[in-house]
């Protein structure tokens, strides 16, 4: 053993101290914490597995297991901090019921819809799966199959899935669970700016003078970003925080202005603020004249319900929900003039004084304002409108695309931006904001993918809620679910989700790491690798793309979703899935598999195994014989480079704590559309919203319209659902972490104390919470973190033993097709 002078001095000092205490100890003894090298811990970096904030963590592995994580002090996102979920990341992969082998429903040794799950090999699993997909394709064509993916897919998993479905199987029936959380945000961006994702970044937190939360409980849902708001607010006395919600929550603890409004009335409040700005001559005319246009949107657009629903039948413009017509400023001003403070107060239940204080924050040209929102705005039957209306306020005042002035749509999932949106795994999208309905976009994708003209269908596929309806109705018969738990997370699950999974006509495949509610409803369960058991990439809410290496192996026969997707493609010959006229355009495809055409096309497979880091394993690269993650990423990056979505070269991301796109000439972009920050803004323009042909953003005239369902005599309460800080989504990971489970083991019904007293209820009482669709049994909570107003109850949805989505309504925004989980009518009765 070699002892350095430093070690010798340290040991001598310890021995001297021990001798002084009368204790005889060896000179080399020490009570100082040993080094990572002594413990044989290997540390690496990875983005957190949970929310869209995109925190970076340091991950320690030992003997093939993740044994510790801590916040990455080098990360500009979280600066060494973690929320409570992040602290326990090392445990999410090690639940006792982790799935380790494929499971197929069988009876008497063969597949049976009503059989019991039995272990099978991957070959048997893919063989029966391919048989069912081929049968459906033959009988019903591409529209008979479907896939439901995730904002938790890695970038290359989502890209491989989209390519397999849209180009391989020629079906646009692929959608991510981000349809439930971010579709309205996408719709808002595209309508107002013509390009998706925020123009600002997290640096805005250190520059803003006021923060306005529109339906976002950041203290629990984006706690690391909330620390930056709290630090700004507590460090600078002039800074103000306004929090708007349909109920009080932990974010109200920091609020200078707390606003509790009636569900759906945020539409009226936003229009009042615009009116206040105009009436008080606070319009930034130089900005508005140079950089905006005005349009009026189609109204009376329905609620995205089934066509036979009375509300849908009554809607006059359901088929043209996203349409709009140009107007001038005077027409717009006249439109919002109807939203007086008196009217807004009457609709919202918010005092006139509070509404005026809120409007003044935006109207004052000397106050830099950051607006922030998530599910309270997006999970809304007029969610796209609400996104548009918030942008209206920032555009009227010119408070946009500069440090501290930022309308910021926060993201829920770790890669809802990077995978669902940027990759384009929605049923209507292609990468880099391209869409399947645009022939030029399809042709561009086909060129990059080296496929013949006409490979990608032009018809928009089924979105998430429509997929469930089509499964129930027998229109989709072969269905693959990855990285989501929709039988727990979807709306109106008893009537519209579960029936499709158990429909005898259908074959349902679920890829997951744990036996979730959705997995248990499947016919075939495929065990998936998690997080750092594979090499991955996520894109967060500020356009930051982050990579990680594979650090450990998945248990048993579990395999990554990427491996599953690509390996499954080997089971299909081109002749089995493509029509003859398409093959005639590419005769060399004859006899080849979809794997050969999609993933061994000379581009995806161009990077050899030698380029994989020698310090890390890569099971997928080993399996396919080339660096598949790099190949998929570089092919995908072709879509965005030169089109405002530029990504850096693959290898650079492993060296960085992420980069914010567009990355041009090696430099990331902090503020988009602003000259000097965004390389796509032409010199001399100052501001240029280049997603629109004329470089101008749109200010929309959009009215208040009532919700699809409101309380009545029989069902007197509003129901709002959501999350809590301890649990991620449906709890399939976090409820398997003992510390997180103990912190919040069971969902409860938060209720105003006076409502409880009126119903003869006390805290802890068991109750039946019921809508016209279904019910759950839960317990009343009249204290604690969430404080609903009278007439509203709040129930989190993480608890698989209390499936609150049996109660919710499957109404959606008619433009974005996103579900409204925030408002339906219920009653609460003692059991």
UniProtKB/Swiss-Prot annotation:
Positions with a binding annotation for [4Fe-4S] cluster: 48, 51, 55, 83
Q: Name one GO cellular component term.
A: periplasmic space
Q: Any keyword Iron?
A: yes
Where is it chiefly localized?
periplasm
The family assignment reads:
Belongs to the prokaryotic molybdopterin-containing oxidoreductase family. NasA/NapA/NarB subfamily.
What is the role of this chain?
Catalytic subunit of the periplasmic nitrate reductase complex NapAB. Receives electrons from NapB and catalyzes the reduction of nitrate to nitrite.
Q: What is this protein called?
A: Periplasmic nitrate reductase
Q: What is the lineage of its organism?
A: Bacteria, Pseudomonadati, Pseudomonadota, Gammaproteobacteria, Cellvibrionales
Name of the gene encoding the protein in the UniProt record:
napA
């Amino acid at each position: 053993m070699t002892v350095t002078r430093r070690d010798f001095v340290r040991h001598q000092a310890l021995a001297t101290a021990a001798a002084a205490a009368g204790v005889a100890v060896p000179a080399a003894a020490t009570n100082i914490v040993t080094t990572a090298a002594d413990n044989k811990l290997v540390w690496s970096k990875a983005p957190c597995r949970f929310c869209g904030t995109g925190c970076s963590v340091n991950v320690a592995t030992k003997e093939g297991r993740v044994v510790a994580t801590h916040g990455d002090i080098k990360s500009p996102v979280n600066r060494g901090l973690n929320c409570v979920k992040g602290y326990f990341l090392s445990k999410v992969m090690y639940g006792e019921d982790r799935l380790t082998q494929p499971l197929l429903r069988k009876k008497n040794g063969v597949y049976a819809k009503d059989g019991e799950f039995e272990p099978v090999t991957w070959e048997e699993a893919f063989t029966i799966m391919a048989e069912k997909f081929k049968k459906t394709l033959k009988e019903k064509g591409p529209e008979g199959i479907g896939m439901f993916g995730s904002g938790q897919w890695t970038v290359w998993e989502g890209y491989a899935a989209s390519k397999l479905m849209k180009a391989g199987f020629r079906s646009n029936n692929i959608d991510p669970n981000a349809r439930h959380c971010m579709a309205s945000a996408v719709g808002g961006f595209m309508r107002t700016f013509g390009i998706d994702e925020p123009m600002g970044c997290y640096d805005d937190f250190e520059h803003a003078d006021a923060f306005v939360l529109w339906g976002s409980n950041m203290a629990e849902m984006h706690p690391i970003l909330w620390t930056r708001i709290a630090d700004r607010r507590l460090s600078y006395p002039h800074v103000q925080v306004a929090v708007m919600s349909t109920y009080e929550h932990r974010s109200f603890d920091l609020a200078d202005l707390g606003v509790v409004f009636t569900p759906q009335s945020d539409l009226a409040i936003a229009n009042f603020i615009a009116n206040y700005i105009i009436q008080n001559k606070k319009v930034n005319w130089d900005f508005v004249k140079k950089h905006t246009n005005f349009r009026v949107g189609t109204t009376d657009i329905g609620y995205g319900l089934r066509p036979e629903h009375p509300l849908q039948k009554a809607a006059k413009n359901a088929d043209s929900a996203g349409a709009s017509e140009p107007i001038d400023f005077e027409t717009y001003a006249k439109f919002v003039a109807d939203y007086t403070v008196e009217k807004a107060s009457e609709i919202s239940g918010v005092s006139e004084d509070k509404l005026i204080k809120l409007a003044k924050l935006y109207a004052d040209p000397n106050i830099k304002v950051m607006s922030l929102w998530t599910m309270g705005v997006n999970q809304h039957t007029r969610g796209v409108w609400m996104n548009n209306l918030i942008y209206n306020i920032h555009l009227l005042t010119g408070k946009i695309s500069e440090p501290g002035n930022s309308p910021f749509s926060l993201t829920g999932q770790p890669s809802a931006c990077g995978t669902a949106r940027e990759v384009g795994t929605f049923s209507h999208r292609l990468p880099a904001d391209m869409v399947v309905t645009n022939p030029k976009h399809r042709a561009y994708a086909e060129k990059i993918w080296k496929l013949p003209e006409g490979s990608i269908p032009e018809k928009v596929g089924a979105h998430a809620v429509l997929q469930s309806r089509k499964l129930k109705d027998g229109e989709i018969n072969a269905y693959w679910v990855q990285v989501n738990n929709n039988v727990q997370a979807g709306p109106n699950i008893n009537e519209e989700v579960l029936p499709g999974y158990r429909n005898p006509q259908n074959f349902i495949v679920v890829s997951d790491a744990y036996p979730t509610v959705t997995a248990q409803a499947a016919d075939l369960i495929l065990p998936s690798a998690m997080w750092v058991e594979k090499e991955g990439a996520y894109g967060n809410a500020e356009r930051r793309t982050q990579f990680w290496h594979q650090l450990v192996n998945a248990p048993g026969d579990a395999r990554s979703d990427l491996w599953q997707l690509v390996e499954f493609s080997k089971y299909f010959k081109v002749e089995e899935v493509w029509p003859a006229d398409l093959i005639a355009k590419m005769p060399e495809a004859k006899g080849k598999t979809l794997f050969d055409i999609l993933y061994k096309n000379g581009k995806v497979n161009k990077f050899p195994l030698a380029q994989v880091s020698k310090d890390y394993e890569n099971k997928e690269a080993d399996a396919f014989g080339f660096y598949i993650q790099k190949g998929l990423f570089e092919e995908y990056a072709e879509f965005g480079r030169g089109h405002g979505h530029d990504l850096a070269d693959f290898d650079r991301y492993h060296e960085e704590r992420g980069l914010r796109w567009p990355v041009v000439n090696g430099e990331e972009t902090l503020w988009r559309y602003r000259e000097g920050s965004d390389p796509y803004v032409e010199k001399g323009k100052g501001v240029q919203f280049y997603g629109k042909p004329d470089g101008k953003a749109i200010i929309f005239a959009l009215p208040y319209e009532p919700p699809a369902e409101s309380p009545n005599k029989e069902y007197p309460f509003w129901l709002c659902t959501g999350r809590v800080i301890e649990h991620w989504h449906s709890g399939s990971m976090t409820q398997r972490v003992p510390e997180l489970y103990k912190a919040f083991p069971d969902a409860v019904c938060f209720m105003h104390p006076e409502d409880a007293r009126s119903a003869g209820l006390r805290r802890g009482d068991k109750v039946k919470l019921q809508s016209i669709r279904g019910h759950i049994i839960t317990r009343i909570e009249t204290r604690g973190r969430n404080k609903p107003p009278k007439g509203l109850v709040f129930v989190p949805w993480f608890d698989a033993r209390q499936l609150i989505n049996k109660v919710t309504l499957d109404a959606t925004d008619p433009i974005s097709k996103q579900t409204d989980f925030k408002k339906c009518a219920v009653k609460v009765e003692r059991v």
